C-alpha cells in the first residue's frame, strides 16, 4: 500500500513541478528537467534559450532531480497526496511541510554558476531569476560573463600567481602604451613590426594558452616571430610589475591559476556543482579549458549554443568546441530547440535556405507558429546612396502606420558601410545611433579621471600614472617622467614611490616642487576615498586634480568642446552614483573600475531611445527588431572578398548571414547595390550568393526606378548623384531629392550623372547616334555651366531627339538633345533659384516624421536651419535644401 501511495505521489509531484514551469514546449521542458550529467542544448535563433536557462536553474534549486524520479525521502501518506492534489487543483503553493518530499538532490542558489557572453545577457538572466526565485535567492546565483567570472576568481586568488588582489585591468589604449615602452626598451622599429601586429599575435598566444616561455622556446618561422616572442615576455613582465592584467589575461591567467593550484580548482568545483554556459559555439580554446577546469567530477555541465550562429572565429572562437561536445563528454544528452518565437515563417525559411548550404553543422530546421508574414523584401539599388534613400522611405512609411524609429535596425557586414546611411540620415534629420562608435568611457576626459581613480586603487599602475601626471599641465615634462621610471626600475618600486620622495633624488631637483604638489594631490585623493562616498570621491577627483578648473578656463576662452567635456564629467559622477545604488554596501572603487573595464559596445546600447539603430551583424548577435535592413548583400562585401578563398571562412560568412536574417521579427529587407563606393573606390559587385540561395517563393524583389527604366529601354550604364554641398561621392534615390533619371536617344540608352558639389555646373545631353549615349547633369557651386550633346560610337555630327531629366523634389526638367547651349549661368545663382525657403508658421510634411510647423529659421551657408515642431516626434532641426520636406496647406 505504501508503495502504491508513493507511486501516486511521484506522479502528482511531476504534475505539480510541471505547473511551476508552465508555457514551455516539449523540447524546452525536456531541457529544464534534465538536470544530471552533461547536457547539450542546440538552441536555434529565437527559440527561447534564456527561458530555458532561467527555468532550468530554478528547477535545480527548487526541486533538483525530483521530476521523473520514483523515489521519495520517506514513504508517501494519504495526507501528502491530499495536500499536493489540492495545491495542483487550486494553483497554490504546496504546504511547507511537503518541501522535503518535493525535492531531490536540490542545491542552494550559490551552488549554481551561469556564464554568458555579454553583460546585457547576464543582467537579463539575473533579473529573471530574481522574479522567479525571489530577490535574495535569485541574487545568490552567480550569473556573469566569462571575463567577470575570471575577475571575481582573480580578486580572491591573484596573489597565488604573483599579482596583487587590487590589480588593474588595462584596456586597448593602456596596452598600446605599455607596448610603446617595451618597443623602446628593446629598440624595436614599429615600421618593421607594427605594435598592432604584435598585440594581435600575443592575443592569439594567450587564447591558445601559450605562455611567454613557450613562445620563446618554440621555433620561430622568421625574425618577426622570434622578436614577437621577446616582446611578449617583456610585455608580461611590465604588466606584472604594474600589478595589471590586460583583457586577454583575465581568462588566460585564471586558467593558469586553476590548472596549477589544485586547492583553488577543488574549491570552485565543490562550490559550483552545476555549471551552465551560454553561447558555447563562440567559446575559444582558453574558454573551453576554463569550463573544463570548473566542471566537477559529477560532470553537471550544461552548454547552450547554436553551431549555426558561430561567428567569432576572428576572435579565436572555435566551432569544434560545440561540434565535439558529445565526444568530449561521454553520456551527453542532446536536445534541439527548433521552434522559433521571434520571426515569421518566411523569414525563417529564408534563413534555413541559406544555412543548409553549410556542411560543418549539427543540423536543425527552425519553424514557427507565428504565421507566414510578409515575404522578404529584396531591393537592388543603383548605389549606396540609393540604398540609404530606400531605407528612409520604408522607415517613413512605418512611422506613418504608427511604428517607432527604435523598431528599425540597419545591419551591415563591415563598419565602413555605415557612412552613407549615417550621412543620409543626418541630412534628413532622422535620429539614429551607431552601436560601436566612440564609447562614453573612451572619451579623453573620462579616461583621464578614471586613470586618477586607478592609481588610487592600485599605486603600482605606472601606465595610468604616465597618462595623467601632467594632465592638467603641471610642468612635469617627458624627460622628468623617464627619470622617474628609471629610478623606479633601479630600486624595484613604483613610480609613485619615487614621486613621494622626489626631494631625495638629485636627478629630480629641477622638478621637485611640481612632483611634491602632485604627491599632495594623490594623498588628498586617498583621504577622500577613505572618508567620502564613492560618488563624492569621483567628484573630488575632478575638483582636486584641477581638471574641472582647466575645462572651465577652456570654456571661458570659447573652446567649443569644453562645455561638453564638463557635462561628460558630470555624467561620470552620475555613473558612479548609479553603480553605488546598484551595489549598496558592496560598492568599491575596484568594483566600479572592473565594471567599466568589462563594458562592451552592446552593453551601452540603449533600447529605450527612439532612434534607428545602425550596427554590424556581429554586434547585433542576441538582439531582435521588428524591422531589419540587411544591407550590402553583394559578392566581395558579404561574403567578404577574402572569405572566397577558404571554405571555412565562407561557412562563417554564411553563418553571419543567418544571424543577420534571424534578427528580424516582422519584416526583413535585404539590399544589394549595382555600384558601391568602399574605401575610396567604386566597386561593381554581383548580388551575394546568399541571396541566390534563398528560394524565390520566400522573397519579393524590387529595383531602383532608374534601373527599371534602363532595363525597360534595353540599355545599360550608371547613374551617380551627390546631394551633399561640396561633396564628391555619387548619390541617387528613387523618391528623394536630387534624383536623376535616364537620357536616351534613338541609337541606344545612356547613363545619367548628377553631382551637386565640386566646382563645375555642367549639363550634357545625350543625342542620337549609332551606339549609346550619355547624359550628364552636374550642379556645382562655383563656376558657370555649359552643355553639349553627342553620340559616343556613332557619327559625331548626328544629334537626335533624346532627353535627359533630373529630378529635384519631384520637379522634372527636360532638355532637348538637339540643343547645344552655353548658358553662362553661375552655379551659385542656379542653386539659389531652386533653393527652398521657409518662414516661421509654415506647415510642412517630412517623409519620415510626418506633419509639423516651422517654429524658427536660421540662415546657414546659403541654406536654412529649420526648426520644426512635428506632431508625432516633437522638435527637430534640419537643413532646408537637403531634407525631405514639402510645404503644405492647412487643408491638406
What do these predicted regions represent?
Residues 23, 80, 88-97, 146-150, ...:
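Conserved helicase/translocase P-loop NTPase motor core
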Residues 47, 281-360, 364-369, 486-489, ...:
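Conserved helicase motor core of SF1/SF2 NTP-dependent helicases
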Amino acid at each position: 500500500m505504501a508503495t502504491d501511495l508513493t507511486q501516486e505521489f511521484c506522479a502528482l509531484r511531476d504534475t505539480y513541478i510541471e505547473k511551476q514551469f508552465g508555457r514551455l514546449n516539449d523540447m524546452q521542458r525536456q531541457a529544464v528537467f534534465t538536470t544530471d550529467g552533461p547536457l547539450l542544448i542546440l538552441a536555434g535563433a529565437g527559440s527561447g534559450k534564456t527561458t530555458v536557462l532561467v527555468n532550468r536553474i530554478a528547477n535545480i534549486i527548487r526541486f533538483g532531480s525530483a521530476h521523473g524520479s520514483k523515489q521519495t525521502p520517506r514513504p508517501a501518506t494519504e495526507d501528502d497526496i491530499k495536500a499536493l492534489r489540492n495545491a495542483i487543483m487550486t494553483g497554490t503553493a504546496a504546504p511547507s511541510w511537503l518541501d522535503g518530499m518535493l525535492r531531490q538532490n536540490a542545491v542552494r542558489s550559490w551552488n549554481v554558476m551561469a556564464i554568458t557572453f555579454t553583460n546585457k545577457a547576464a543582467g537579463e538572466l539575473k533579473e529573471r531569476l530574481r522574479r522567479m526565485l525571489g530577490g535574495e535567492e535569485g541574487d545568490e546565483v552567480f550569473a556573469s560573463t566569462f571575463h567577470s567570472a575570471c575577475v571575481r576568481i582573480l580578486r580572491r586568488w591573484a596573489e597565488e600567481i604573483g599579482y596583487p588582489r587590487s590589480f588593474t585591468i588595462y584596456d586597448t589604449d593602456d596596452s598600446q602604451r605599455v607596448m610603446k615602452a617595451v618597443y623602446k626598451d628593446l629598440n624595436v622599429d614599429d615600421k618593421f613590426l607594427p605594435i598592432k601586429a604584435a598585440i594581435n599575435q600575443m592575443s592569439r598566444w594567450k587564447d591558445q594558452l601559450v605562455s611567454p616561455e613557450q613562445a620563446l622556446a618554440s621555433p620561430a618561422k622568421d625574425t618577426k616571430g622570434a622578436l614577437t616572442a621577446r616582446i611578449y615576455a617583456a610585455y608580461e613582465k611590465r604588466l606584472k610589475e604594474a600589478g595589471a592584467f590586460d583583457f586577454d589575461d583575465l581568462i588566460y591567467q585564471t586558467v593558469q591559476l586553476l590548472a596549477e593550484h589544485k586547492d583553488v580548482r577543488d574549491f570552485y568545483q565543490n562550490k559550483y556543482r552545476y555549471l551552465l554556459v551560454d553561447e558555447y559555439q563562440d567559446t575559444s580554446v582558453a574558454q573551453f579549458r576554463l569550463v573544463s577546469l570548473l566542471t566537477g567530477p559529477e560532470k553537471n555541465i550544461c552548454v547552450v549554443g547554436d553551431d549555426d550562429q558561430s561567428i567569432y572565429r576572428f576572435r579565436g572562437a572555435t566551432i569544434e568546441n560545440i561540434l565535439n561536445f558529445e565526444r568530449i563528454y561521454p553520456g551527453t544528452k542532446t536536445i534541439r530547440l527548433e521552434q522559433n518565437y521571434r520571426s515569421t515563417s518566411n523569414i525563417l525559411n529564408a534563413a534555413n535556405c541559406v544555412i543548409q548550404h553549410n556542411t560543418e553543422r549539427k543540423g536543425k530546421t527552425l519553424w514557427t507558429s507565428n504565421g507566414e508574414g510578409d515575404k522578404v523584401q529584396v531591393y537592388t539599388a543603383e548605389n549606396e546612396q540609393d540604398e540609404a534613400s530606400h531605407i528612409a522611405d520604408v522607415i517613413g512609411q512605418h512611422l506613418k502606420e504608427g511604428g517607432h524609429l527604435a523598431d528599425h535596425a540597419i545591419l551591415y557586414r563591415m563598419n565602413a558601410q555605415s557612412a552613407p546611411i549615417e550621412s543620409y540620415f543626418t541630412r534628413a534629420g532622422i535620429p539614429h545611433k551607431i552601436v560601436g562608435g566612440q564609447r562614453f568611457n573612451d572619451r579623453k576626459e573620462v579616461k583621464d579621471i578614471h586613470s586618477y581613480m586607478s592609481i588610487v586603487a592600485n599605486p603600482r599602475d605606472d601606465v595610468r600614472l604616465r597618462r595623467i601626471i601632467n594632465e592638467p599641465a603641471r610642468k612635469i615634462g617627458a624627460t622628468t617622467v623617464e627619470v622617474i621610471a628609471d629610478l623606479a626600475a633601479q630600486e624595484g618600486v613604483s613610480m609613485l614611490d619615487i614621486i613621494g620622495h622626489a626631494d631625495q633624488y638629485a636627478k629630480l631637483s629641477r622638478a621637485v616642487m611640481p612632483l611634491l604638489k602632485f604627491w599632495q594631490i594623490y594623498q588628498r585623493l586617498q583621504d577622500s576615498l577613505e572618508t567620502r562616498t564613492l560618488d563624492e570621491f569621483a567628484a573630488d577627483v575632478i575638483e582636486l586634480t584641477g581638471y574641472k578648473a582647466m575645462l572651465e578656463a577652456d570654456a571661458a576662452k570659447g573652446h567649443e568642446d569644453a562645455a561638453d567635456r564638463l557635462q561628460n564629467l558630470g555624467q561620470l559622477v552620475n555613473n558612479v552614483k548609479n553603480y553605488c545604488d546598484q551595489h549598496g554596501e558592496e560598492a568599491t572603487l575596484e568594483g566600479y573600475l572592473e565594471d567599466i573595464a568589462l563594458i562592451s559596445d552592446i552593453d551601452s546600447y540603449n533600447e529605450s531611445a527612439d532612434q534607428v539603430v545602425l550596427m554590424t551583424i556581429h554586434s547585433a548577435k542576441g538582439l531582435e527588431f521588428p524591422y531589419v535592413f540587411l544591407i550590402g548583400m553583394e559578392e566581395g562585401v558579404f561574403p567578404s572578398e577574402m572569405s572566397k578563398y577558404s571554405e571555412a571562412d565562407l561557412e562563417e560568412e554564411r553563418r553571419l548571414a543567418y544571424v543577420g536574417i534571424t534578427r528580424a521579427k516582422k519584416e526583413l529587407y535585404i539590399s544589394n547595390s549595382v555600384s558601391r563606393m568602399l574605401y575610396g573606390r567604386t566597386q561593381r559587385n554581383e548580388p551575394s550568393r546568399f541571396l541566390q540561395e534563398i528560394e524565390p517563393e520566400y522573397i519579393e524583389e524590387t529595383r531602383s526606378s532608374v534601373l527599371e527604366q534602363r532595363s525597360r529601354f534595353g540599355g545599360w550604364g550608371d547613374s551617380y548623384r551627390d546631394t551633399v554641398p561640396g561633396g564628391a561621392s555619387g548619390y541617387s534615390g528613387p523618391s528623394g531629392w536630387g534624383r536623376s533619371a535616364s537620357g536616351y536617344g534613338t541609337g541606344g540608352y545612356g547613363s545619367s550623372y548628377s553631382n551637386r558639389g565640386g566646382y563645375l555646373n555642367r549639363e550634357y545631353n545625350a543625342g542620337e547616334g549609332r551606339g549609346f549615349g550619355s547624359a550628364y547633369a552636374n550642379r556645382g557651386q562655383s563656376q558657370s555651366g555649359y552643355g553639349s550633346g553627342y553620340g559616343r560610337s556613332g557619327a559625331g555630327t548626328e544629334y537626335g531627339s533624346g532627353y535627359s531629366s533630373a529630378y529635384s523634389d519631384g520637379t522634372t526638367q527636360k532638355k532637348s538633345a538637339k540643343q547645344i547651349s552655353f548658358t553662362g549661368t553661375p552655379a551659385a545663382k542656379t542653386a539659389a533659384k531652386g533653393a527652398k525657403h521657409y518662414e516661421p508658421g509654415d506647415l510642412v510634411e517630412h517623409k519620415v516624421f510626418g506633419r509639423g510647423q516651422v517654429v524658427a529659421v536660421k540662415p546657414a551657408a546659403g541654406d536654412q536651419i529649420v526648426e520644426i515642431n512635428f506632431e508625432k516626434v516633437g522638435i527637430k532641426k534640419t537643413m532646408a535644401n537637403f531634407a525631405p520636406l514639402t510645404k503644405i496647406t492647412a487643408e491638406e
